[in-house]
């Protein structure tokens, strides 16, 4: 077994070809030419630390993905990539190291294999994981950005800066989860996938492989679809315990689970314009993937072949487990074996039945919870709409009152304006006229006696005139009569006073 491991190690030390990776300096903003792998060209905020280095992973002279690497934990914090495509089969696995992580003064700017780095890099392995750290351990090099999702012939993903310790079973389930999510849930709901930004990362635990490389407590994935008018963002978490399945979370909730509470995507991947219908479709597929994973785990746990040798040995009688060669021991073992097999069969049947019952109850509970969540969501939406309508009316009341007050003030101003106009017109009349109008009653009252006097004098004169006229007329008549009488023989003399 040791020989096979050393042969495998020798095969991993093969020439890297055109594979390279550039260590981005602290003075450079972002990840340099690898900023294109981040939404809006902006790496996650809040993850900067002295022990973190930025790497622009390249292959064949082109950028492939970006990695933020922790020199303290010797595992990647996250890797960022876009639009994954299936990789060609038969590519050779060549695990490489980054020389400038351990030796900043190194002239080697490309990733090289560990065998070459031993003689050319000072303090190799002081800040990054090496292939030898994984030898004789229960862990394998698990890629955050899997080779199976890369179309690079030179396999840029086979760098130790893109790997973290994973058990074989967890690594297999993690890769299956990534393939299922990318092929069935994420890429189909993001157009052609060209606008799909992916972040995969780790959260280290306190346990370390050979007291050097931190084993992840859980791994996570965050996806941002930047399709105009139909974008979305989702997060996923998978704990390294064998019994755990991948969990879907909102990006905001995922950020709270990570150290330093970072912001993974600028403005949360256009949160205000996200397409909720596409997110619902993604969650439906994710639920199917989770159910499939539970089914696979249930089948594995119920299989007799999956039991360990230690569990089988505990069911054997002491004579058989000790390998007694006595006839009595063999006889007892022969007699006890059928009962032990029967007990094992009953045990596995009971366990399988219980697991299926629990799984059935879990499915029923999940459906009930989903129904309750749907009802609560609709009730909440209706309540919010109701209060929004009431709020709009309440908010509009002050505005309407202000409009009425404004109209009243406007009417009062019009009345005041009319009064001012009347006053101005009155004030524009000459003062003499106003005095005459004011003194008219006085003059009128003072002229009444004079007018009455004049009227009386006029009436007296008229009466006197009438009397004079009457007497003159009578005198004239008498004069005529006397004249006639004189002519006819009567002589009557009158003096001037009219006496006979």
UniProtKB/Swiss-Prot annotation:
Start and end residues of each stretch annotated as Disordered: 293-323
Positions of post-translational N6-acetyllysine modification: 407
Annotated Low complexity bias: 297-317
GO cellular component: cytosol; extracellular exosome; extracellular region; membrane
Alphabetical GO biological process terms: innate immune response
Localisation: Secreted
Known EC number: 3.1.30.-
GO function terms (MF aspect): endonuclease activity; metal ion binding; nucleic acid binding
EC top class, as a word: hydrolase
InterPro entries, sorted: DNA/RNA_non-sp_Endonuclease_sf, Endo_G_ENPP1-like_dom, ENDOD1, ENPP1-3/EXOG-like_nuc-like, His-Me_finger_sf
Alphabetically ordered keywords of this record: Acetylation, Endonuclease, Hydrolase, Immunity, Innate immunity, Nuclease, Secreted, Signal
PANTHER family per record: ENDONUCLEASE DOMAIN-CONTAINING 1 PROTEIN, ENDONUCLEASE DOMAIN-CONTAINING 1 PROTEIN ENDOD1
Function in brief: May act as a DNase and a RNase. Plays a role in the modulation of innate immune signaling through the cGAS-STING pathway by interacting with RNF26.
Subunit field text: Interacts with RNF26; this interaction is important to modulate innate immune signaling through the cGAS-STING pathway.
UniProt record similarity statement: Belongs to the DNA/RNA non-specific endonuclease family.
Protein name: Endonuclease domain-containing 1 protein
Source organism of the structure: Homo sapiens (Human)
Lineage: Eukaryota, Metazoa, Chordata, Craniata, Vertebrata
